[in-house]
């Protein structure tokens, strides 16, 4: 069960304590990065991508990390757990939150939600069983 206790108590702390991690290097990643900066004053968002996308890698708003096998679930999970451990050592009040930029990464993050939450990462996705059910068109239409 997810711990519902807020880890960031005041809106003014969001820009300092929330550390977003975006998986995937496409235009949606850039949108996440810019909107997180605009809305919360987050100076840099970590972006994990398999290729060097210059629009992102050269942006002052990103901490761009090339992870060639980012589409491999175990590589992604280990990378995220390492980042969470890095933040925990730096400041235990930091709240890492991960976002996927495509269906593949959203599914991977949902599937490992409990594992990543155990590492201290906020995973804003529904549990995998429900995600799997509602993203299969035939079953989705039956449910509707």
Give the location of each predicted region.
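A short, Lys/Arg-enriched amphipathic alpha-helix followed by its capping loop at the start of a domain
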Residues: 35-43
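Extreme N-terminal starter segment of soluble prokaryotic enzymes
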Residues: 15-20
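Glycine-rich adenosine-cofactor-binding loop
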Residues: 21-36
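Hydrophobic beta-strand scaffold residues
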Residues: 44-45, 123
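A short, basic/flexible loop-to-alpha-helix module at the beginning of a structural domain
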Residues: 2-14
């Amino acid at each position: 069960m997810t711990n519902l206790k807020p880890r960031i108590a005041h809106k003014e702390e969001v820009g300092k304590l929330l550390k977003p991690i975006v998986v995937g290097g496409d235009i949606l990643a850039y949108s996440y990065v810019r909107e997180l900066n605009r809305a919360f004053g987050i100076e840099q968002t970590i972006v994990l991508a398999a290729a060097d996308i210059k629009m992102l890698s050269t942006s002052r708003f990103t901490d761009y990390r090339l992870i060639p096998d980012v589409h491999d679930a175990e590589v992604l999970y280990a990378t995220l757990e390492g980042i969470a451990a890095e933040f925990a050592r730096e400041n235990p009040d930091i709240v890492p939150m991960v976002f996927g930029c495509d269906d593949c990464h959203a599914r991977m993050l949902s599937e490992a939600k409990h594992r990543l939450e155990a590492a201290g990462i906020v995973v804003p996705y529904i549990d995998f069983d429900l995600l799997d059910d509602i993203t299969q068109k035939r079953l989705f239409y039956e449910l509707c």
